[in-house]
Amino acid sequence: MSEMTARFSEIVGNANLLTGDAIPEDYAHDEELTGPPQKPAYAAKPATPEEVAQLLKAASENGVPVTARGSGCGLSGAARPVEGGLLISFDRMNKVLEVDTANQVAVVQPGVALTDLDAATADTGLRYTVYPGELSSSVGGNVGTNAGGMRAVKYGVARHNVLGLQAVLPTGEIIRTGGRMAKVSTGYDLTQLIIGSEGTLALVTEVIVKLHPRLDHNASVLAPFADFDQVMAAVPKILASGLAPDILEYIDNTSMAALISTQNLELGIPDQIRDSCEAYLLVALENRIADRLFEDIQTVGEMLMELGAVDAYVLEGGSARKLIEAREKAFWAAKALGADDIIDTVVPRASMPKFLSTARGLAAAADGAAVGCGHAGDGNVHMAIACKDPEKKKKLMTDIFALAMELGGAISGEHGVGRAKTGYFLELEDPVKISLMRRIKQSFDPAGILNPGVVFGDT
């Protein structure tokens, strides 16, 4: 047994430290499509913040790189370990510690899956609303990537729904940031700095999340449009109406066809309409009162028809849920039809038509294709890229990311930089900002052990 194996085992116990062939293959990767799997030298499963602190202190003193893992649902490679490194799995730190209805918060450990948090709050009339599409994803992963998802148009992303953290620094020191309140104006906001840092600054061991009223009545309207510009012209009208949709998604015709064929969707849309439309707008509403929901759905349908929709299909209950669940799998449907990479750029909402039309043109010029869907309400584009020539694909991705930034957007809206996008980030982002980020990283992690290679590409 090596010295480090013995030290890590002493901290978490022999049963909770894995090495060699005992490390599961799943621990070698997340859901990033292009990065090669890499097993760590050690995989530890701590049960307490104190054990995490001891692991980090030992790793820091011995120069062992550390990668944190929640559910492994990330799409950018931030949970892919480093050769010779330590993977810290939060499988055992998976408890909802408290549901505080008076303050409308829950206190949870980082390994809690969204499904378990939803179950824990089901009888309270409250819920955690961040909905990144993978309900098996962990709250810690949500924090690490600043996850968003379909409900961000109404409820915001993770940083809008996290009020406080407990985190462990690479030195083994444990800090608390924020609290069970919306206001803190005392020094720098370390909560927000750690959110979205992809495990490069500190490891989160406890999260205080905001809970919102649980609205039990839900319905959706799906509207096909002949022209994508009409879809995007309808979005600000819907948002300005006061109806407050919790989901507002566009789906292009190619992606919808893939969803229908791979997910066995029955939407009742005639073939001639499906063949003639360019894109769809999905509007989901929720309410405590069924009659009010019905009135709002009727209003949305009428608005969409006035704004140029070919038709408006009301989906309730199981049919609405099935479409939303299928939308969550949109990229995997596109992948089944030949896509080999994904981007999640974000641009100002009004720039989406220009971004999408230009990106498709760039893809066609590279003998490829760019199709997809996205969060029309917040400008986050999920585009599946098909381009078989590796050099052409790399240039295409660079050009699309550059286009997003030229339009005032960013390379990633919710998946993060991870390992997959470091080259694009370093090439296209403001070097002054990158330098400042490096200094922040150095301040938190002077030994450079936390997720080396993530964000900055340094290993």
Curated annotation (Swiss-Prot):
Stretches that traverse the bilayer: none
PROSITE patterns: FAD_PCMH
EC numbers: 1.-.-.-
Sequence segments annotated as region (Disordered): 28-47
Cross-referenced Pfam families: FAD-oxidase_C, FAD_binding_4
Gene Ontology CC, one term: plasma membrane
SUPFAM superfamilies in UniProt: FAD-binding/transporter-associated domain-like, FAD-linked oxidases, C-terminal domain
Domain FAD-binding PCMH-type: 35-214
Cofactor(s) this protein cannot do without: FAD
Isoglutamyl lysine isopeptide (Lys-Gln) (interchain with Q-Cter in protein Pup) crosslink location in chain: 354
InterPro entries reported in the protein's UniProt record: FAD-bd_oxidored_4_C, FAD-bd_PCMH, FAD-bd_PCMH-like_sf, FAD-bd_PCMH_sub2, FAD-linked_Oxase-like_C, FAD-linked_OxidoTrans_Type4, Oxid_FAD_bind_N, Vanillyl_alc_oxidase_C-sub2
Record-annotated disulphide pairs: none
UniProt protein name: Uncharacterized FAD-linked oxidoreductase Rv2280
Kinase recorded as keyword: no
Similarity-based family: Belongs to the oxygen-dependent FAD-linked oxidoreductase family.
UniProt-recorded Gene Ontology molecular function terms: FAD binding; oxidoreductase activity
Keywords from the UniProt entry: FAD, Flavoprotein, Isopeptide bond, Oxidoreductase, Ubl conjugation
Protein's organism: Mycobacterium tuberculosis (strain ATCC 25618 / H37Rv)
